[in-house]
Structure formats: structure tokens, C-alpha cells
Amino acid sequence: QPPAEVSDQRVSGLTGAVHSPPKGPNWAAMPTVRTPAGGGDAHNVRSLSVMWTTRLVRSGLAALCAAVLVSSGCARFNDAQSQPFTTEPELRPQPSSTPPPPPPLPPVPFPKECPAPGVMQGCLESTSGLIMGIDSKTALVAERITGAVEEISISAEPKVKTVIPVDPAGDGGLMDIVLSPTYSQDRLMYAYISTPTDNRVVRVADGDIPKDILTGIPKGAAGNTGALIFTSPTTLVVMTGDAGDPALAADPQSLAGKVLRIEQPTTIGQTPPTTALSGIGSGGGLCIDPVDGSLYVADRTPTADRLQRITKNSEVSTVWTWPDKPGVAGCAAMDGTVLVNLINTKLTVAVRLAPSTGAVTGEPDVVRKDTHAHAWALRMSPDGNVWGATVNKTAGDAEKLDDVVFPLFPQGGGFPRNNDDKT
């Protein structure tokens, strides 16, 4: 249900959430959604595309090429998966004849050892973080229980990139991953993990052991889940769970139940984090709308699940609440529409905001129902398609379904542009 009112609370350090295209390989056009100015009919929308053409980065890819060969070539994961824009992107209406993104999977599946039709990869353990490759055909996926990060592809067998030691007790483990904004140069990945004593943020270099960035985040029997995202080339935002204790989320001296800002993340002499937002329950997901720079925060509290918004002007509002607590998880946003995974009800819904007011224009639309069951992560690929990753093996489903990485719109069309874009 929509919130009763909008808060004018300000959050330090989350301004400038509109970002510049990073240097790296070409990205395909990404379809966007836009509601009419003035908050008119939310279903009358038009498709836009943003063309990002950048220089191909040739250095530092040899280590990753061995992971995904076959017909897909070398899997590439660069700055653009972690670094949002720092300048307003130029948006131009595309001709009506511009086709939407094609079906994300080939008509004939690659003959993998794990036969899982209709997905990029099957036979996974319960997943957490997901990073799409710049070719829209490869990805990095994290397994929460095992701590493994796997390189996967639509046309190659998976390969383990690294295994991070974690304690998966309760809902902890390897909870999210994100690439450095300068990944093409430094090959660094950040992870949010559980240890036997705490939750923490670590940095992982290729072929090296994890190095601590932020430690001492309270750990509990539940409420450990969280998320990571870069809101600028130098700012890492961390959403931490309340460790099962809402009082910790309200305690300014605790790192639990917060959206934290880490400036210039480093393993030596790290500046203490600052709190951007308090009162977080169990973490769901973080996502940025690259068109208007809004940061969306999905979390689960004792009274309701909710979706909050932090604008590029650092204003905070509650976008939507779910009193029935369907289990909000990962999200993806584009031009005022936010897709949110609901784990308990096996749904993905689209929440739409009016551009002039930021108010929700109606009940969330269901864009996925039951397909692949319980999905957590949700990420957009550069070609405009949307991908999810499931947590069936740990979601209490009696069927004990395999966990997979799958396209949200298998028939193509990409990010939903109107209420007819449903599966």
C-alpha cells in the first residue's frame, strides 16, 4: 500500500547518484520507461534508449578468458556493473521502429552437463549476489551457503572464480557481491559476508585472500542479510540487517540495521563509515535508477516489508509498504519503475512512480508469477533484459527446486515499458 506521507528527511553523502558512463566495452541500448510529465496515465509510456559507446578495454582480461570460452568468448565484467553515472545521460526518443531487446537465450540451448532449459545456468546452490557481464550473455553469481562466486554463460559450462570463507548459519553467508568501479584496471570485487563472530565487508583481488574493509557489523540468528552498491566511483554503500534486534537498527552507535556509506574503501586505514539511513530491518536489496539517480532500498521489518527511495537531492520517502510481508528482496530500477522480487509469494512486481511527484501511480503490477519460484537477486543486463537468481534450496519450498539464473522476460522486450509487458 502507498505510504501515508512522504518524509523530508535528508541523508548525507548520497547526492550525485546520477552517474557518467564508465570507460569500457560498448554497451547495447537499454530500453527505459517514462511516465508522462505531470503524473498522467502510468500506462501511457514511451520507450527510450541510451547508447553508451566506449573504448574496448583490452588489458587485464586474460585471467577471465579461460573461464568462459566456447562460443561466448571471454566473459567481461567492467566498471559499468558497479559504477552508476556522474553526469546526466542524454536521452533521445528512439524511432517507433526501433525493436526491443531480443529473447535473451539462444533458441537451441548449449548442451551443458546440467540440463536446465530456459535459464543461463542451473544446478546452483542457493544464490545471493548477481553481476551481469557487459555482453549480456555472461554473469558472476554468488552462492550464499558455499561462499563460491561462479562465472556462468549461456554458451559455456560454469567455472568457479573464487570461494570466500563464510559462516552460513541462519541467513548469513556470502550475501552480496559488487565489482570495483575500476574493475577493468584493478580486478577488485567487494563482498558482504558473515563470519563466526560478525558480518563484514571484504575486498577480493584475483588470486588473493579476502581483505577486510569494514568489520564488527552485528550478527544474529536472523536479520543478517544485506546488500552492496557503488553510488559514485569512490562511495560504497552497504545495507546491513538488524541482526534480529530492531533496537540495534535505532541505535546510532550500532552498525546494524543501517545504510552505511564507505568513502574510498581500502584495506589500510579505512575512514569510519557514516550512516545514511537508520531503521533497516532484514536487508533485501539496493538499486539505482540511472535516469534520475534515485537509490531504492528494499527491506523487511517486523510490521511490514517496504521500498524506500533516496533521491539525488538526499530526500528520503517510503514508496510502498507490504503489510502482508511477502519477503522483499532484490530490485532493479529504470526511469521511475522499480522491479522488486517477493520471495515468499514467488512474484516479481513493478512499482511505478510519477515523474513530477514521485508518488506511486497505482498498485504494483505482477510481471512474474511462480516461474522459477523463489527469486532473490534482480539485475538488468546492458542490452536491457532483466535477470533473476533463485534461492529455492533455502526458501523452505517443499519441492526443493534447483537454483538458477534466469531471464525475467524470456520472450524478449527487456525492462517493462507498459502494463502489457508481463510474463
Residues of each region from the PLM?
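Sequence/structural signature of beta-propeller domains
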Residues: 46-48, 52-423
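Short intrinsically disordered, low-complexity coil segments enriched in acidic
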Residues: 1-6, 314
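Short, low-complexity, intrinsically disordered N-terminal modules
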Residues: 4, 14, 18-21
